Amino acid sequence: PRSVSSAASDVYKRQLFDQILALEWIQEYVAYFGGDASNVTLIGESAGAGGIGHLIASPLSKDLFHKAVHQSGGSSLTYPTSSSNVRKLANSFANSFNDPSIKNLKNISAEEVLEVSEEVYAEHYFNYVDDGFSVNRNLSDSYKSGNIQNVDLLIGSNNDEWSLYFDGNVNIRLWLDQETTPEKKIKLLELLTDIEDPVRKMDLLITAKNFVCPSLFMAEELKRNGGKTWVYQFNRVRDDELAQKYGAFHGAELPYVFDTHDQWLPTNKADKVLTEEIQSYWLSFAKTGDPNNDGAVVWPEYESSNDSTLVLDNEIYQRSHESSEICKIMDLF
């Protein structure tokens, strides 16, 4: 990309550079395809949403896009990866071979790479790296300082983001010991006293920390920076025994956004109606910068005073986010 051509060869967000290159291409050529370079909307889910979170904070993406749909992302804010840690892991990986030179590493088989990677990177989450170049500082600090793009944002997450990833061993107190302070642990346990199912309780906590709290934080900071923001919570659970087990899991909203329902879970009239409603919000936001459109339930802009959220379920309605109190206690940012 033009904006990174002078970068030294170091630990940078190469994936982010690819995204910036694509956005530069859109600015230069989209008009030839009937597009509008002054009305570019990004949409991403999970890791894709993480990329959007960094593009919003990157000085390299200035004026390359104007709106963003951020679905079920946020771990980059709660679990930043330092460039020094990445260098240590890279050196450990290279030194696992007799000859760690670049020339030799290029000739290593895929099987050898996978075998060593499983050991070296066993506990490593491949998140975006805080490199001090593509983003000037720690990501959350960039948002708090206002060093972000002035764009509009539609952001949210699902009710049961972590339900697919439990292995049957749920130890809430141990997790709280690792993730928060003793004082916050007591408050969180008191807040969740009425929830009897330990898996649901754990899911609620992890969903809040990794998805909800970062989303509310981003919505507030972009609004404070002059952008308009809307927050949603996807709660729809299919009418099926398997669906009831996992709830509104990570990625469950995607078939509704893109109308790509398949046979893995049953799809009925309620799902089709919700699909049309979600698509109308998303498309209206991309076209006009406002998700509200004729016939749809009104979606108010986000206000931190009440954590205003649009719930997408069998019925669509507005309320304060159910995890806002968890986020206030966690106080992550």
Kindly give the residue locations of the regions a language model identified:
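Single conserved hydrophobic/aromatic residue that forms the stacking wall/gate
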Residues: 1-12
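Alpha/beta-hydrolase active-site loop
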Residues: 13-31, 88
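Active-site loop->helix "elbow" adjoining a glycine-rich segment at hydrolase catalytic centers
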Residues: 14, 46-49
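Alpha/beta-hydrolase-fold catalytic nucleophile elbow
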Residues: 43, 58, 69-72, 155-157, ...
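Short glycine-enriched nucleophile-adjacent loop
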Residues: 49-61
